[in-house]
């Protein structure tokens, strides 16, 4: 069944009409030219990524140049398996926050508190911890009367009782799991007009990981749904890899782009308000790194190729002026994420599917 699905998917991509019109801001989709532009940016900023070519000319796609058929990074470590104990709570569902990838609630409306990211492990059915009454038993085995609440104060000396220490059984630590490595491939899906991720695992440099075992490193809700085992169409032969299906990628990226723009706008408003304030505390607070999408905006802005030039121009024009100077009009029209930075954001959200794989190993963001 997977072979048939892989074949149909490959031919659908190759036969679909090629779009040359940029709709990046309105749909979250990119053209082949924009994919190459974003790939060049990723390779330039993060040298662990490189361009790859098909194993033979017949495997190349016509809408991408030879030598730039896909992006690849090799040897990405994966130190843990994602079993039912992932993130601490056994036998509990993963909490999917705005689960775009699996097709649930993909609109940009509502859910403003989570910025469209995924929290996995033990959140779907939260336990409300309760403290039960602690009763003592006398020497005859009879339960003593309930004591007043204010008397239930633990004795600090009890912490020194070596017999009270609960030791973890031997062999239960996660460090006993062998480290796997993955080669990650980013291709362009011409049918969906978005990037697509393939993963190929290894138990050792010379021992490939059986495809079925790759699913141990995929979040449970995505196995065999969003993530399937398919042949990599750029190589001769039948090399199966785990692949994240791109059907929801455009809507996810569109939502993240919109929210990043909103976060940048909010950031600028804060700068304006702080510029009018003489409070050093507010200025110091603004200088601290942000979290969520505002933090992502700061990270992306820090990757801008033109930052050094802008900083140089700012130093010349500032002449000792206030560092909290209000942004110029042309800067206010600037978007939070450019099209050449597309793959940086793409890898940030796709990492939620495989949280055990250290994607940050390939990126310094």
UniProtKB/Swiss-Prot annotation:
The active site is at residue 247. Residues 85-176 are annotated as: Flexible region. Residues 251-341 are annotated as: Handle region. GO terms for molecular function: Atg8-family conjugating enzyme activity; Atg8-family ligase activity. Residues 103-160, 272-291 are annotated as: Disordered. The keyword Plastid does not apply. The N-terminal region is involved in phosphatidylethanolamine-binding and is required for atg8-PE conjugation. The gene is atg3. Keywords: Autophagy, Cytoplasm, Protein transport, Transport, Ubl conjugation pathway. Its main location: cytoplasm. InterPro entries: Atg3/Atg10. It comes from Emericella nidulans (strain FGSC A4 / ATCC 38163 / CBS 112.46 / NRRL 194 / M139) (Aspergillus nidulans). Belongs to the ATG3 family. It is found in: Cytoplasm. It comes from the Eukaryota. Monomer. Interacts with atg8 through an intermediate thioester bond through the C-terminal Gly of atg8. Also interacts with the 40 amino acid C-terminal region of the E1-like atg7 enzyme. Also interacts with the atg12-atg5 conjugate. One of its GO terms (biological process) is piecemeal microautophagy of the nucleus. Pfam families: Autophagy_act_C (PF03987). Residues 125-144 have a biased composition (Basic and acidic residues). GO terms for cellular component: cytosol; mitochondrion; phagophore; phagophore assembly site. Residues 145-160 have a biased composition (Acidic residues). E2 conjugating enzyme required for the cytoplasm to vacuole transport (Cvt) and autophagy. Required for selective autophagic degradation of the nucleus (nucleophagy) as well as for mitophagy which contributes to regulate mitochondrial quantity and quality by eliminating the mitochondria to a basal level to fulfill cellular energy requirements and preventing excess ROS production. Responsible for the E2-like covalent binding of phosphatidylethanolamine to the C-terminal Gly of atg8. This is Autophagy-related protein 3. The keyword Cytoplasm applies.
